[in-house]
Amino acid sequence: NFTNSLLVGTDSTGTLSSAEGNTGVGTGVFGALTSGDGNTAVGLNSLDLITTGSSNTAVGKESLLANTSAGENTALGFRSMCKTTTGFQNTAVGTNTMRQNTTGDQNIAIGYRALDANTTADGNVAVGADALITNTTGNQNTAIGTNGLEDNATASNNTAVGFSALCDTTTGAGNTAVGRQASSKNTTGAENVSMGLNTLYTNTTGSDNTALGFCSMFSNTTGNNNVAVGCGALDSNTTASSNTAVGQGALQANTTSINNTSVGRVAGHKTTTGHSNTAIGTFAHCVNTTGNCNVAIGVCSLCNNTTADHNTAVGYKSLFANTTGTQNVAIGAYNSNCNTTASQNTAVGFDSFAKNTTGTCNVAMGFQTMRNTTTGGD
């Protein structure tokens, strides 16, 4: 019985019993078919070993060659899915796509050698030449772009969109990379998010990082729990963790320091090893290098601070000129904005203590209080 079927070629059917609606064109197609229905095979030995599988489409020499009982697969291209035996609902388009797949289900591979090594993994999507080419058992991965997730073997739940995105990842799971070479060097780092050209480019084992914007966190290798949003944000960070940089060039020079928060264009821009600083506002704390535990809130607040520690500046240009003075508190616009090296001053109010340069241990409370004091102390 071969009801409603079409067969063209030699050595093309096995022992038919109740197969219906099959179409075969080429030598060796349907060589073992018994009862499978609704299959289409075009090309030498395509669907050659199928027995009971139904609703398969194989176009190309040896496509779906080893399929026996699996159904609802589509293979287009030379040797595409040629080793699949019982895997269901897969789609493979391109030469050698999903070539090693045996029992994996619900995979999509489009492009030369995409998902080539996949054996038993399920729910993967690979679009692009060599996308997910070495994946064997990793599940629910998505790679769109040439070489996307190229070295991934067993890791699951990764998403890579863009040329060579996440291409070196081997076992790192739960990563999302969107953009050319985004997270390209990542190997075992997990649960990272990188969006933009070359974001998190050199990250290898760092985990739980978020990088959005051109070259943000470009140099990070092992740092964890960082957030970088904006072109060049945390660009030089290598091993530091728990930093947050939002804005173009924010914390751009940071390498190994931890627990910094910078929000605003070039906020905390030159900080290298200073830790536990908070800078909010354009140019806030922007030339700090090694100063620690400072708080700068407002445009240009603590703008010139370099190595000083434990200062608090709130307001436009508050403590603007401070370089090495420590343990100062300035609240209000222009507050203590001429202070350079003085320490342990407290000033609250608009323009208060504005002209002080080196005076220490002063307290000024109120509008323009002690505005003209320059060097007094105690």
Regions found by a protein language model. Name each.
Residues 1-378:
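Glycine- and small/polar-enriched repetitive beta-structure motifs of secreted/surface proteins
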